[in-house]
């Protein structure tokens, strides 16, 4: 009888509990995004297994980061208001068309900067 009463109280308590609010979105751009990714994803250099050989996927990620591809992607997706207007420089018609194509193609990094990311969104960007 006591077990049934306890079970009923637990069910009632969980039914009365308010639903959890949606996860907060934070606008993350540039180095703030990189810091958040390192915090959420971690990496082989920060993990306890740092003495073990680096996994192939992690090695590729480290090489990618060292070659500054991530920084290039962040700059490419930066706010167009921060870039000089390519229309003012007649010597750069090719770069202007590239910028227009880049602005059309949105990616996760761009979305994090413009509309914000949740922790779950950041986890989706982790390589492992």
Swiss-Prot record:
<comment type="function">
    <text>Seems to play a role in testicular function. May be a trophic hormone with a role in testicular descent in fetal life. Is a ligand for LGR8 receptor.</text>
</comment>
<dbReference type="GO" id="GO:0043066">
    <property type="term" value="P:negative regulation of apoptotic process"/>
</dbReference>
<dbReference type="GO" id="GO:0048471">
    <property type="term" value="C:perinuclear region of cytoplasm"/>
</dbReference>
<feature type="signal peptide">
    <location>
        <begin position="1"/>
        <end position="15"/>
    </location>
</feature>
<dbReference type="GO" id="GO:0090303">
    <property type="term" value="P:positive regulation of wound healing"/>
</dbReference>
<dbReference type="GO" id="GO:0007193">
    <property type="term" value="P:adenylate cyclase-inhibiting G protein-coupled receptor signaling pathway"/>
</dbReference>
<dbReference type="Pfam" id="PF00049">
    <property type="entry name" value="Insulin"/>
</dbReference>
<dbReference type="GO" id="GO:0005615">
    <property type="term" value="C:extracellular space"/>
</dbReference>
<dbReference type="GO" id="GO:0008285">
    <property type="term" value="P:negative regulation of cell population proliferation"/>
</dbReference>
<dbReference type="GO" id="GO:0002020">
    <property type="term" value="F:protease binding"/>
</dbReference>
<dbReference type="InterPro" id="IPR022353">
    <property type="entry name" value="Insulin_CS"/>
</dbReference>
<dbReference type="InterPro" id="IPR016179">
    <property type="entry name" value="Insulin-like"/>
</dbReference>
<keyword id="KW-1015">Disulfide bond</keyword>
<dbReference type="InterPro" id="IPR043387">
    <property type="entry name" value="INSL3/INSL4"/>
</dbReference>
<keyword id="KW-0165">Cleavage on pair of basic residues</keyword>
<feature type="compositionally biased region" description="Low complexity">
    <location>
        <begin position="81"/>
        <end position="94"/>
    </location>
</feature>
<feature type="disulfide bond" description="Interchain (between B and A chains)">
    <location>
        <begin position="41"/>
        <end position="126"/>
    </location>
</feature>
<feature type="disulfide bond" description="Interchain (between B and A chains)">
    <location>
        <begin position="29"/>
        <end position="113"/>
    </location>
</feature>
<dbReference type="GO" id="GO:0001701">
    <property type="term" value="P:in utero embryonic development"/>
</dbReference>
<comment type="subunit">
    <text>Heterodimer of a B chain and an A chain linked by two disulfide bonds.</text>
</comment>
<dbReference type="GO" id="GO:0005179">
    <property type="term" value="F:hormone activity"/>
</dbReference>
<protein>
    <recommendedName>
        <fullName>Insulin-like 3</fullName>
    </recommendedName>
</protein>
<dbReference type="GO" id="GO:0141163">
    <property type="term" value="P:positive regulation of cAMP/PKA signal transduction"/>
</dbReference>
<keyword id="KW-0964">Secreted</keyword>
<feature type="region of interest" description="Disordered">
    <location>
        <begin position="81"/>
        <end position="101"/>
    </location>
</feature>
<dbReference type="GO" id="GO:0001556">
    <property type="term" value="P:oocyte maturation"/>
</dbReference>
<dbReference type="InterPro" id="IPR022352">
    <property type="entry name" value="Insulin_family"/>
</dbReference>
<feature type="disulfide bond">
    <location>
        <begin position="112"/>
        <end position="117"/>
    </location>
</feature>
<dbReference type="GO" id="GO:0008584">
    <property type="term" value="P:male gonad development"/>
</dbReference>
<dbReference type="GO" id="GO:2000018">
    <property type="term" value="P:regulation of male gonad development"/>
</dbReference>
<keyword id="KW-0732">Signal</keyword>
<dbReference type="GO" id="GO:0010634">
    <property type="term" value="P:positive regulation of epithelial cell migration"/>
</dbReference>
<dbReference type="GO" id="GO:0008284">
    <property type="term" value="P:positive regulation of cell population proliferation"/>
</dbReference>
<keyword id="KW-0372">Hormone</keyword>
<dbReference type="InterPro" id="IPR036438">
    <property type="entry name" value="Insulin-like_sf"/>
</dbReference>
<comment type="similarity">
    <text>Belongs to the insulin family.</text>
</comment>
């Amino acid at each position: 009888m006591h077990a049934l009463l306890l079970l009923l109280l637990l069910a009632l308590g969980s039914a009365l509990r308010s639903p959890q609010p949606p996860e907060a979105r934070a606008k993350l751009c540039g180095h703030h995004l990189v810091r958040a990714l390192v915090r959420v994803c971690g990496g082989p250099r920060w993990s306890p297994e740092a003495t073990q050989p680096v996994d192939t996927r992690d090695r590729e990620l480290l090489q990618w980061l060292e070659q500054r591809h991530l920084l290039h992607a962040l700059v490419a997706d930066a706010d167009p208001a921060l870039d000089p207007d390519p229309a003012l420089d007649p010597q750069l018609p090719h770069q202007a068309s590239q910028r227009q194509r880049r602005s059309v193609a949105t990616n996760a990094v761009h979305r994090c900067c413009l509309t914000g990311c949740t922790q779950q969104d950041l986890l989706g960007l982790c390589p492992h």
